[in-house]
Amino acid sequence: MSVSHNCGWSIWTLAVSFILWVLSQSGVATAASATAEVPVSIAPTEHVILFVLEGFGQNSLKGGTMPTLSRLVKEGAVTWSATAVKPALRLPTMASLITGMPVEKHGITWNTFEFSRGYPRAPSVFDYLDLSGGRDSAIFLMDESLYQLARPEPYTDYQMCGPLKPECSTDRIVSYIRQYFNKATSGHGYGHAILSLPHFLVVHLPEAGRVGASRGWTSKEYRDALRRVDKAIHSVMDIYQEQGLTKRTTQFVTSLSPEGSDANQEPADAAVPMVPWIASGVGIKPGYAIHQPVSILDTGATVMRTLGLQTHTEWDSRAVEEIFQAAFAAAPQGSSLQ
């Protein structure tokens, strides 16, 4: 009896031990499965920079002329054939970029500032950012024609430094941005509309296009201008790094005109220009070639998508969804990101 009892006890002990082992392994497998199914946590984007160039294309990067932009391309998503608009001029193209509308809808076909025409009636991405999430925008422009788009609102700040002022240069516009950020972080605002760091910064950098049109697209002067534009992009990104914002910032780069095309004169051919469109930074797939058709009109909706915002307004801008690492996650309601 004693032997039988001990054998029974041993068998029962082994059975219990086996069940516990199975349960523990099941828990490990479940935990591993759960870990595999949960995507890598990606910090939300709180700031977006949009660099708007002129006279820029894929060939502009050859010879190491633009190392900062080359790095953004390598670390981000790109298409070199985003469609622009007709007429292929600075003001109509910029109007389409910020309204997310084709020229036939926003109606701006001219290329100089005409006070009598007033501001465009169409809402802009700046309006949608405010309405959808209370996000502010700061816009730095380098051509007086773009005054046409500078409709004053409590959630936008515009600064202009165009060719009519001889002292204006790419370096000068960067210094304005640095001053703006210094005032924003001083605790005193800047005497303008926004009293905090802007959530959306637009930087217009047309120097390369102007130099290419006047001195030749194969000239040394054009390559030097590309280098200055690249240096400006690097300097603006340095400002964000100094403010500790790099890990919360996404950058976009596009151009109002391709290399070889003057944004002041419409080309003789009827083709719609193709321009670069680049996204890089927080939440963007690295080293990714965009497959879907992209239009510069899509920039506004993609910026909003990046910030976790949506608009149900009918406009022609569509988010370029394939560039993102994770599915859309709405920004917290009522958040005040700085």
Predicted segments with their positions:
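Bacterial N-terminal signal peptides
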Residues: 13-25
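A long, amphipathic alpha-helix that forms part
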Residues: 42-44, 174-175, 181-185, 209-249
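Metal-dependent active-site segment of extracytoplasmic phospho-/sulfohydrolases and closely related
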Residues: 49-50, 68, 229-267, 303
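Structural recognition of the beta-strand scaffold that forms the well-ordered cores
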Residues: 49-52, 79-81, 96-98, 136-141, ...
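Short, structured active-site-proximal loop/turn typified by the sulfatase FGly-forming signature C/S-X-P-X-R
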Residues: 59-94, 101
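Substrate-binding rim/cap in mid-to-C-terminal beta-strand-loop elements of soluble/periplasmic
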Residues: 94-98, 267-310
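His/Asp/Glu-rich, glycine-adjacent segments
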Residues: 101-216
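Polar, surface-exposed loop/tail segments
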Residues: 294, 309-338
